[in-house]
Amino acid sequence: LGKFSQTCYNSAIQGSVLTSTCERTNGGYNTSSIDLNSVIENVDGSLKWQPSNFIETCRNTQLAGSSELAAECKTRAQQFVSTKINLDDHIANIDGTLKYE
């Protein structure tokens, strides 16, 4: 599963969207984007792989290293805490296109 960072480069996060240049099976490259909002949830200040809308309660999203989504997310107590989730766990490069698996 996942492991997009092994074959994708120049990755960046803007809001909830991951964009990367990914290798294709024919040797070429394709720029691809995926909205992580549909697959990641904020659970009391912690990012989890669940369909939701994390961006409504998280801020300052960025890519940490080559594959981690870092953000400040709101807890039930309404305080923002730092959290990360490894996108390589479920985001894959399928012939130049970023996909959730």
Curated annotation (Swiss-Prot):
UniProtKB keywords: Antiviral protein, Disulfide bond, Lectin
GO biological process, alphabetically ordered: regulation of defense response to virus
Free-text biotechnology note from the record: Overexpression of this protein to provide quantities adequate for medical use as a topical microbiocide has been attempted in a number of systems including E.coli, Lactobacillus jensenii, the yeast Pichia pastoris and Nicotiana tabacum; see PubMed:20162270 for a review.
Post-translational modification: Cleavage, or reduction and alkylation of the disulfide bonds results in the loss of anti-HIV activity.
One Gene Ontology term of the molecular function aspect: carbohydrate binding
Resulting phenotype, N30 to A/Q/V: Prevents N-glycosylation upon overexpression in yeast without changing anti-HIV activity
SUPFAM superfamilies for this protein: Cyanovirin-N
InterPro entries: Cyanovirin-N, Cyanovirin-N_sf
Keyword presence, Disulfide bond: yes
Disulfide bonds: C8-C22, C58-C73
Other facts noted in the record for this chain: Its activity in situ is unknown, however it acts as a viral entry inhibitor, inhibiting HIV-1, HIV-2 and simian immunodeficiency virus (and some other viruses such as feline immunodeficiency virus, measles virus and human herpesvirus) infection and replication. It prevents essential interactions between the envelope glycoprotein and target cell receptors by binding to carbohydrates on viral protein gp120 and possibly by other mechanisms as well. Addition to cells must occur before or shortly after virus addition. Is remarkably stabile; the protein can withstand multiple freeze-thaw cycles, dissolution in organic solvents, treatment with salt, detergent, H(2)O(2) and boiling without significant loss of anti-HIV activity.
Complex formation: In solution exists as a metastable domain-swapped homodimer which very slowly converts into a more stable monomeric form at room temperature. Under physiological conditions it is unlikely that the dimeric species exists and indeed the monomer is more active against HIV. Interacts with HIV-1 gp120.
Protein family (similarity comment): Belongs to the cyanovirin-N family.
PANTHER family, per database record: CYANOVIRIN-N DOMAIN-CONTAINING PROTEIN, CYANOVIRIN-N HOMOLOG
Function: Mannose-binding lectin.
UniProt-recorded name of the protein: Cyanovirin-N
Source organism (scientific name): Nostoc ellipsosporum
